[in-house]
């Protein structure tokens, strides 16, 4: 579609008196309101009425949680760099989505190039095979190899066909070392992405009177995408990695 019907509906709902939506969308919007600085927005809902309330808990767990996994980090690489194998139907990278929007800013373009380049250090094509064979290709894959090795070392039945779960604390020395390296990488990656988000936010505020509605919507969508798909998860992952290097955790 020329415009995503879900995105169009969300945009229209901001000015509606009554909105009917599913639990997942309500929770995601509530979770992202704080991230995007919209918690005090007058257009935020003031009343919620839930039907089939037993779904709320799963929706809340999904919306307000984060997971540091090889899959999630590989998805971020794909979102930032786009299709790298020439076979997958998706996806456009950040260069194609943002390039023409920030073409007038050398600083923003430099940040975009830096972020795209650093994303190479996240898990890439074939990561599952490399991690299972303990042959990591970069810092991120090294961390997940360390996690996998620790799981098999601590599992009571490492040959089980079902999911393996073990206590993470205290983390092995190898996990802590690889966690610090990955944290440094994620911090380096978050810097240019934050610059991009700040630049887009500035464009919205400074050019509000001159932007046509389509361009403004594209910039707003790009800003929300950066916060939801990049800077938000990166901040959560860094907290997890920092926490992993402690001896134990309360709660």
PLM feature spans:
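Short acidic active-site motifs
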Residues: 8
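Short cysteine clusters
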Residues: 4
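Conserved coupling segment at the C-terminus of the helicase ATP-binding
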Residues: 1, 11-17, 30-47, 52-251
């Amino acid at each position: 579609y020329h415009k995503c019907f879900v995105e169009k509906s969300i945009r229209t709902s901001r000015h509606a008196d009554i909105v009917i939506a599913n639990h997942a969308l309500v929770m995601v919007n509530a979770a992202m309101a704080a991230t995007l600085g919209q918690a005090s927005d007058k257009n935020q809902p003031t009343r919620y009425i839930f039907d089939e309330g037993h779904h709320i808990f799963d929706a809340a767990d999904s919306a307000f949680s984060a997971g540091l996994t090889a899959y999630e980090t590989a998805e971020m690489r794909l979102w930032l760099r786009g299709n790298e194998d020439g076979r997958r139907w998706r996806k456009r990278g950040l260069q194609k989505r943002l390039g023409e929007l920030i073409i007038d800013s050398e600083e923003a373009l430099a940040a975009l190039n830096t972020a795209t380049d650093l994303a190479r250090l996240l898990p890439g094509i074939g990561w599952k095979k490399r991690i299972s064979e303990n042959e990591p290709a970069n810092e991120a894959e090294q961390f997940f190899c360390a996690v996998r090795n620790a799981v098999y070392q601590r599992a009571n039945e490492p040959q089980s066909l079902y999911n393996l779960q073990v206590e993470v604390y205290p983390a092995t020395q190898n996990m802590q070392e690889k966690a610090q390296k990955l944290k440094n990488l994620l911090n380096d990656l978050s810097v240019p992405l934050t610059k991009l988000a700040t630049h887009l936010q500035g464009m919205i505020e400074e050019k509000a009177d001159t932007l046509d509605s389509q361009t403004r919507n594209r910039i707003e969508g790009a800003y929300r995408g950066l916060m939801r798909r990049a800077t938000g998860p990166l901040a959560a992952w860094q907290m997890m990695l920092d926490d992993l290097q402690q001896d134990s955790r309360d709660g």
